[in-house]
């Protein structure tokens, strides 16, 4: 079991590493902030579910459920794990270049875990700002602070078998309630049990946790980003972050192309070059994050003999390494390179990570040694299997 007093650490480490204090907010709040800051809101169309995309060499056209039609140069799909954009990209490739998308890729999405997530009002026994990871065999509780002492939480549990797309069914409210009741009496932190969170929960749902890094990210004038092409579990909390990174990296490539072309319309081949370069570089980064996410998910749920041993006897002694390593992962991501970087970020995010662990919140030497020991044990055990 791990617990951080995030409220105190974010005041000290946040400005040193990122240039600004760390703030915790819901995705809805983030979207509201971003939307409010838009100078031209007319380009944001809500209630426009895309049902069809036709990609041609000179143009691309999308049709929505309400009959609207939009024509342009490029479609970037950030429409989640059940992506219509991805399906339409596959359809276009199958029609225009049969065999370009391998059949095994279309069935590479799978789920081995489920996740119950919820938002609770302040729970007595959990102090404001505390972030908790509680591990059991085949089960992990993640509790993190939100605004005004409220708590966001995940209960991530190993499924009885691996489900492969399209055999990944959603869970009903009845499934959610039954699973919650089965976990109600499990301790979370000191005298706090999972049932104490449930009693104060305002919203709760259950979903399968799909995992996959697709091979093909773009075809024609179609590009996929975020969960539509790279689906992580929430254990390392990088799903939304990497989707935003993807949008930034695409914007960098397009800005460079438009700046180079001036008033000339980008050609089909030029757009292909930008999309291909983006897919290659971002997929390389995501491959590393997928490996980390896969490993952490199974370590925290103590899946298998190795993870059970490491999870019980080593992981709980690694201190704040997760906090620091997550910060380093974020620092290595792309940023918008055509906007001036605020001085605070330039100093905090770039310079401090060049000397990782030597700024205002250095990683304890005991933690470093513990992590080296953990990795050594894992490598040795795997070498004899």
Swiss-Prot record:
It is found in: Membrane. InterPro entries: FAD-bd, FAD/NAD-bd_sf, FAD_mOase_fung. The keyword Transmembrane applies. One of its GO terms (biological process) is terpenoid biosynthetic process. Its EC number is 1.-.-.-. SUPFAM superfamilies: FAD/NAD(P)-binding domain. GO terms for cellular component: membrane. Pathway: Secondary metabolite biosynthesis; terpenoid biosynthesis; Mycotoxin biosynthesis. FAD binds at residues 27, 227, 240. Belongs to the paxM FAD-dependent monooxygenase family. This is FAD-dependent monooxygenase verC2. It comes from Penicillium polonicum. The gene is verC2.
């Amino acid at each position: 079991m791990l617990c951080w007093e995030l409220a105190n650490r974010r005041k000290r480490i946040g400005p040193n590493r990122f240039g600004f204090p760390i703030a915790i907010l819901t995705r809805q709040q983030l979207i509201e902030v971003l939307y409010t800051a838009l100078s031209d809101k007319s380009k944001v169309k809500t209630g426009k579910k895309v049902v069809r995309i036709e990609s041609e060499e000179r143009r691309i056209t999308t049709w929505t459920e309400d009959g609207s039609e939009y024509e342009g140069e490029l479609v970037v799909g950030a429409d989640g794990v059940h992506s219509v954009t991805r399906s339409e990209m596959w359809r276009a490739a199958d029609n225009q270049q049969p065999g370009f998308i391998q059949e095994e890729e279309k069935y590479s999405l799978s789920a081995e875990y489920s996740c119950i997530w919820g938002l609770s009002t302040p729970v007595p026994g959990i102090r404001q700002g505390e972030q908790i990871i509680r591990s059991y065999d085949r089960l992990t509780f993640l509790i993190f602070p939100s605004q005004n002492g409220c708590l966001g939480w995940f209960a991530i549990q190993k499924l009885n078998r691996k489900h492969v797309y399209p055999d990944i069914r959603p869970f009903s409210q009845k499934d959610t309630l039954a699973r919650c009741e089965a976990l109600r009496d499990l301790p979370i932190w000191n005298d706090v049990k999972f049932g104490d969170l449930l009693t104060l929960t305002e919203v709760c749902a259950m979903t399968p946790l799909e995992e996959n890094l697709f091979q093909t990210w773009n075809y024609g004038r179609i590009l996929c980003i975020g969960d539509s092409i790279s689906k992580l579990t929430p254990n390392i909390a990088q799903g939304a972050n990497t989707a935003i990174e993807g949008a930034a990296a695409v914007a960098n490539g397009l800005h460079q192309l438009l700046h180079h072309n001036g008033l000339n319309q980008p050609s089909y081949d030029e757009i292909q070059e930008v999309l291909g370069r983006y897919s290659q570089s971002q997929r390389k980064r995501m491959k590393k994050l997928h490996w980390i996410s896969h490993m952490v998910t199974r370590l925290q749920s103590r899946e298998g003999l190795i993870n059970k041993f490491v999870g019980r006897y080593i992981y709980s002694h690694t201190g704040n390494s997760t906090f620091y390593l997550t910060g380093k992962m974020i620092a290595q991501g792309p940023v918008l390179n055509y906007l001036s970087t605020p001085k605070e970020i330039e100093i905090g995010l770039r310079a401090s990570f060049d000397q990782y662990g030597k700024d205002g919140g250095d990683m304890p030497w005991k933690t470093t040694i513990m992590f080296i020991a953990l990795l050594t044990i894992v490598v040795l055990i795997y070498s004899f299997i």
